[in-house]
Regions:
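Nucleotide-activated donor-binding/catalytic signature segment of Leloir-type glycosyltransferases, i.e.
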Residues: 253-270
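Nucleotide-sugar donor phosphate/pyrophosphate-binding loop at the beta->alpha transition
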Residues: 114-116, 123-147, 190-194
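Short alpha-helical donor nucleotide-sugar binding micro-motif in glycosyltransferases
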Residues: 269-270, 277-282
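Aromatic "clamp/platform" in nucleotide-sugar-dependent glycosyltransferases that forms part
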Residues: 290
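Short hydrophobic beta-strand element within catalytic cores of glycosyltransferases
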Residues: 307-311, 321
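Donor nucleotide-sugar binding/catalytic pocket of nucleotide-sugar-dependent glycosyltransferases
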Residues: 141-196
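Conserved donor-binding/catalytic core segment of Leloir-type glycosyltransferases
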Residues: 6, 205-221, 227-230
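Conserved acidic donor-binding segment of nucleotide-sugar-dependent glycosyltransferases
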Residues: 323-324, 328-335, 344-350
Length: 396
């Protein structure tokens, strides 16, 4: 019988909170205690307020943060917390490099719980690692993935990577990113009728094609590389690109904007209501990432009924895009094709845009409806755990 589920992760951020809230509520409704163990309040480089996202089901552990050679955590309280919580199932998230997660793995036999890893990375991510670091990563990944009893995977691409390293008897559960979908769906639908007023508010010409890219201003988001492609589009002079977000790559992006002369607006950090406004006045969602495991913004765009244009490095593109029906996936390795897809999007008819919006909403409901996903996930894991208990060996 499953009485306790524990998720060990680096932080609770505003984008994941609705998912954790949903897990807690559903687990509580079927008599399961759900707990989140946190390694830190807020990851370095992010600016949300921990006081607004903290929850009664979450425990902030004491520990130490390391920034070299990569960001890492060592939370010595995790073992005591696990002893007290007596979990039947443990999920670790964030990174398999975290020392805290290593401690959880090391104690799974002693404390008798299976460990699942929430893996969102995929084989098509571009990383700025040198060959030595790549080799180290490969060795560590191969060792640690073989230790996990199962995985939460975010889509087709992430499962492909997992299967390369996991044990043959590993269990798999599809866990897409989830958001507070009703807020995006209902608010954006209402605001669509106020497009002229919203464009005037943000000083955007009504006849311009508006692209929205909510993203950190960082190298991995590929904004600087996408602007070179956009600059070759036939309708580039009728485009306004909105980028709500902050980051340490801002100067480089501003330089690229100056070089191209494109109408690209760096809007800085924006609250959720402002971001939904921006979605509602936009024509298309664009995410040109060079590395992006499982971005939530794609799911926000689906629930707002937008057509999408994303790169092949975006990990959930097989789930969020039906090629030509609600958008396009482009490859930086094929520059000509990428520019052609930008042109197709910008010159698309009103009829296609309406059909694409309907398709986006259908995909959102199919893959990213929290009411369906959370119940299926918990019920499947409980059934799986029950079978393991009956077999007489909880930890394979």
């Amino acid at each position: 019988m499953t009485n306790s589920i524990v998720l060990v992760t680096n932080e609770i951020n505003p984008y994941r909170k609705s998912f954790y809230d949903g897990l807690y509520k559903y687990c509580e409704s079927i008599g399961i205690k759900f707990t989140v163990l946190l390694m830190t309040k807020v990851e370095h480089g992010y600016n949300w307020d921990y006081e607004k996202v903290k929850s009664d089901y979450a425990i902030l552990m004491k520990g130490k943060h390391f920034s070299f050679p990569i960001s890492n955590y060592l939370n010595w309280e995790v073992l005591e917390d696990l002893k007290n919580l007596k979990p039947d199932i443990v999920i670790v998230a964030g990174s398999y490099f975290y020392y805290t997660n290593w401690m959880v793995i090391a104690q799974r036999y002693k404390l008798n719980y299976p460990v699942y890893f929430w893996s969102e990375t995929h084989l098509q991510e571009a990383r700025a690692y040198n060959s030595f670091l790549l080799k180290i990563r490969e060795v560590i990944r191969r060792i640690l993935y073989s230790k996990f009893d199962g995985f939460w995977f975010s889509g087709k691409l992430s499962r492909q990577l997992i299967e390369r390293y996991a044990r043959k008897d590993a269990k798999y559960h599809f866990v897409p990113n989830l958001i507070d979908h009703t807020t995006y769906l209902n608010t954006s639908a209402s605001l669509r009728n106020q497009r002229a007023e919203l464009r005037a508010k943000w000083n955007i010409p009504l006849d311009n094609e508006v692209l929205i890219t909510p993203a950190r201003l960082s190298w991995v988001k590929g904004i600087h590389t996408f602007l070179d492609l956009l600059n070759e589009a036939a309708l580039r002079h009728k485009v306004t690109m909105l980028i709500p977000g902050t980051g340490d790559f801002k100067d480089e992006i501003e330089l690229k904007i100056k070089e191209t002369g494109l109408d690209v607006r760096l809007l800085g950090y924006q609250q959720q209501d402002s971001v939904i406004e921006l979605y509602s006045l936009s024509d298309f969602f664009v995410l040109p990432s060079l590395s992006d495991p499982n971005p939530l913004t794609c799911i926000e765009a689906l629930w707002c009924g937008l057509p999408l244009l994303v790169s092949t490095h975006v990990g959930n593109y097989p789930e969020v895009i039906q090629e030509c029906q609600n958008g396009y996936v482009f490859d930086y390795a094929n520059k000509t094709d990428a520019v052609e897809k930008i042109d197709k999007l910008l010159s698309s008819s009103a009829e296609w845009r309406k059909s694409a919006a309907d398709c986006s909403l259908q995909l959102a409901n199919k893959y990213y409806n929290p009411n369906n996903v959370i119940k299926r996930l918990v019920d499947d894991m409980v059934r799986e755990n029950s079978r393991i208990e009956k077999s007489g060996h909880k930890c394979p």
